[in-house]
Curated annotation (Swiss-Prot):
Belongs to the SufE family. InterPro entries: Cysteine_desulfuration_SufE, Fe-S_metab-assoc_dom. Pathway: Cofactor biosynthesis; iron-sulfur cluster biosynthesis. NCBIfam families: PRK09296.1 (NF006792). It comes from Dickeya dadantii (strain 3937) (Erwinia chrysanthemi (strain 3937)). It is found in: Cytoplasm. Keywords: Cytoplasm. GO terms for cellular component: cytoplasm. Participates in cysteine desulfuration mediated by SufS. Cysteine desulfuration mobilizes sulfur from L-cysteine to yield L-alanine and constitutes an essential step in sulfur metabolism for biosynthesis of a variety of sulfur-containing biomolecules. Functions as a sulfur acceptor for SufS, by mediating the direct transfer of the sulfur atom from the S-sulfanylcysteine of SufS, an intermediate product of cysteine desulfuration process. Homodimer. Interacts with SufS. Disulfide bonds: none annotated. The lineage of its organism: Bacteria, Pseudomonadati, Pseudomonadota, Gammaproteobacteria, Enterobacterales. One of its GO terms (biological process) is sulfur compound metabolic process. The active site is at C51 (cysteine persulfide intermediate). This is Cysteine desulfuration protein SufE.
Amino acid sequence: MAQLPDPQKLLRNFSRCSNWEEKYLYIIELGAGLAPLSDAQRQDGNRVSGCQSQVWIDLASNEQGNVVLHGDSDAAIVKGLIAIVFSLYQGLSVREIVELDVRPFFASLALTQHLTPSRSQGLEAMLRAVRARASALI
């Protein structure tokens, strides 16, 4: 998997895009950098309900107590949204993930105004899924 940008770099890169077409292309590019999921990770238990597209998110913690995230979707833009979500949570502990409110970050991207309602609902479902799965590891 390509290294995901940290939230500040992601915000800078996003703001450098001159229009929403470029921003969508950047989101898709981020998603293309995600490592493919194994068949074991593509199980029903990792499927995120509430998304129009097929979405899988696998969450585990490593020896240092930091969360390791893997995800995939059958839709390129959604896969990019997964990458954005992962960039916010990468390297954090399960407790930090549960306590972190990422909605202000997404508000600063103005994503919800430019996503279809079903994509916005899917993004919320992904955020809820990550937090719920992190909570289960506490």
